Amino acid sequence: MAASSEEKVSLRTWVAVLGTVLGAFMAVLDIQITNASLREITGGIGSTAVEASWVSTSYLIGEIITIPLTAWLGRVFGVRLYLLVNVSLFLVFSGLCGTAGELTQMIIYRALQGFTGGVMIPMSFTVINTQLPPSKRPVGLVLFGITATLAPAIGPYIGGLLTDSYGWPMVFYVNFIPGVVMLATVFFAIDPQPLNMPLLWKGDWLGTVFMAIGLGSLIAFLEEGQNQDWFTSVFIQRCFTLAVIFIPLFIICELVSKTPVVNLRLLRIRNLGLASAVNFLLGASLYGSVFLLPEYLEQVQNYSARQTGEAMVLIGLPQLLIFPFVPRLMKAFDLRLIVFAGALIFGGSCLLNIHMNPDFGGPQFQIGNVIRALGQPFTIVPLSALATAGLLREQQADGSALFNIMRNLGGSVGTALLSTMITQREQFHDFRIGERITPYDPYVQQFLSNQSIQNLQHSGDPAGALQQAYRMLQSSVQTNSFVMAYSECFLALGVILLLGSVTIWLCKKTKAVGAAAAH
């Protein structure tokens, strides 16, 4: 009977959970929603396409630095005050991003936006695990899971729709709607806590500096490496050097410090450490697939941002039908089995795309997207529960920061490797196909003859018609090379998810969620 009283959750607590989940959703969405509008933002701030990549990179740098700090600063200022200040600043910087007139301004505003927005992701996770009793946490984790899987899927659609209808600044101004709602819910639903300023002064400031330099350099290296041709760039060389030096220094500082900013010792807890490793692989697959599909549709099929977003929606919407069933499954089955099944389904959806051809467009991705949408809810939610099941209440904030930063790092590593893989494999296939194409090949002769006749009918210039036929042949070779490269990238994602599905069995078996509440 005691369990039933523990299971009662007040409306005020649910409002607090929903408010923080809304903030996490907004923070995750803010990457994909702007990626869909980079072309328009580039024109608005007068930058090149390569420079515009910093619109996303600067946000990710700010986010990756702040996530590890949330547990410490949350204890210093209290959850309520810490969230209120950061959400308010996030809205201020969102507004400034919409008014930016040149690249430097945009980079600064986006970095600060990421620094304040990144707070919302682990804090939402912490509120769920500290405010809800064990039997109700699956529901809270489902809500959190929506932010991790639904936001990246629908972000391109929302970004394309807002940009086409109202212009690119609206992708930043739209944050005011959920932001104000979150401010109200946090203000009224979370109790104020006393300040703990001595904890601020006793914090490991040296480790904080090492962490900021190391992780910031790592993200810059990963996100900008492909654009700047990796180690041929002095900037990329310096970023790599800083990351290699300062990340180990940060780890050493945290392990020897009596008051670490990030309690890395928690990773020795078997389930948290292994689940975080699986979360790294899941992040690489989740954000990698969100990166691959739009890139393919825009590069190979010449889709607009809005068309790409419409193709991505099918990844997001079916998840809303699946998520409500996840808590029941978590109460009935081994969490490892649910994650295993979800990873296999997700991986299978990627493997459906390994035999693409140049006619493979949005409609051909639909079946795979729906299957992917069916698998994703069964990965992130039970994996989150598995990671935090053995943590004490006072360890939840640090565990949340570690678990979530691994997904973000996985996403950055995954997209960087996939971006490089596309370029390298396209060049490889272009070379191999080119070896087989000779003027004496009957298929090549037939292609050139047919295209020359068609071109001649429009131009009336025999020499020009033949030259245009050669250009069309070259374009066809390049298109096929890209298609094969993208197919191999989807194969790589499938292998990564298979690896994650196997690794999850190394975790200790935990009681079905909700079983603990009965004791």
Positions of PLM-derived features:
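Transmembrane core module of solute transporters
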Residues: 11-71, 75, 80-83, 89, ...
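Hydrophobic transmembrane architecture of multi-pass small-molecule transporters
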Residues: 2, 6, 37, 51, ...
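Glycine/proline-centered helix-kink
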Residues: 122, 143, 148-160, 164, ...
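Small-residue-rich alpha-helical segments with characteristic i,i+4
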Residues: 151-156, 365-448
